[in-house]
Amino acid sequence: SIVVTYWDKNKNFEPIGIMTNFSELNLIIKKLKINGIDTLDNIISGRGVYKLTQTAHNEHPEIEDIQSRGHKNDVGTGVFGKLENIIFFKDKPNDGRKYTKVLGLLDKNREYFWVDTRYITHTPDYTKFKVVLPKANGTGLLEDKPSMMIGAPLVLEPFVAFTETFISIGAFDNEEEAHNALKYIKSKFARALLGVLKVTQDNPKDKWKLVPLQEFNSNSDINWTK
């Protein structure tokens, strides 16, 4: 094919940058850049933030042989199946030890398992409320239902961890703020801006960098009760 390009050498234009088929979205994106607005990716975790500790390996050396090569510390998507009844338990053991509740997948279903608290690292949001959602789900099509674009997000209470299947949003002091954040990411506005960069199933934090960050408490100019 042949491409013919025209330009006006007497004018200086701004770079096109990110462009969509929707004029409203293009205007919002332009305002974000001009005003330097904080965006949601600043409070989203990366993938695989929880890891197995050296204590877990010291007390259960068989873990290294079971885990994939080079990933001995990963709390991966299949960890419940691999390490069930070794360090992860469906029912909380009654042995006097302190255990951490972990959200993950088993046979493609969401499940909670328990692990000795000494066996898993703790992140800054571990003691806080947070919103978790699948790291990969659906597409970025604006026609997608919320569940197709962002999966089925939920609020996790403090002292609950999660496997690499999920990423988390925020580290909130109270449950109300977390539920307000949940409402926001399910809104058409947030999903539309997410869809600008999310064109595949992958849903890492950098795909959210066009979604404006909001105040999720009572100081917000948004009425979260609606």
Predicted feature locations:
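C-terminal substrate-recognition regions of SAM-dependent nucleic acid methyltransferases
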Residues: 2-225
